[in-house]
Amino acid sequence: MKWVSVNTGASYEIFELWNGDRKLANISFSNRTRFARIVSSFGKRIFSFEKRGFLLPKEVVKNEYGIKMGEVEESRPGSGKGQVMLDGKKYLFIYDENNSGELVLYDELMQKSLLTCSFNMVNKGLMKTRSLFDNKFASLLLVLCWYTFQPHSASAAKAVS
């Protein structure tokens, strides 16, 4: 899978999630608000993203009803490692190991790789920042996990592995 930056304007940014030659989802971020609109085969959703914390920053995602769905936390700013909590489950991630531009998501014990996703098409802005929370990385990661781990997307999760 890979994220592709489609359009970056003054008022919005649009990204697409691709698996091979098939578009899986489209997400558009409003630069004026903290909301994002997601369109996928699962329907249309609106998520809100909040940055929290000072010494240990994290990004929290809430659904359209304001209910917390999950969060991303970076182990150390600039480390490219951290954890994702989504629907009560914990996952660990490593981003850009060996300058690959790819993210690998593991189970809680780091025994099994659950998915790999390329951020090469959107990582120009990621390389210029000290923390992964200075850009849309955490939001894209949360949407990627949400999409992949939908209960009715078992075939999508198997295709990713």
Question: Predicted segments — roles?
Answer:
Residues P57-M85:
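Helix-adjacent hinge/juxtasegments
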Residues M1-F35, S41-I46, S75-S161:
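Low-complexity or membrane-interfacial segments used for flexible interactions
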Residues F35-Y65:
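Short, well-structured hydrophobic secondary-structure segments
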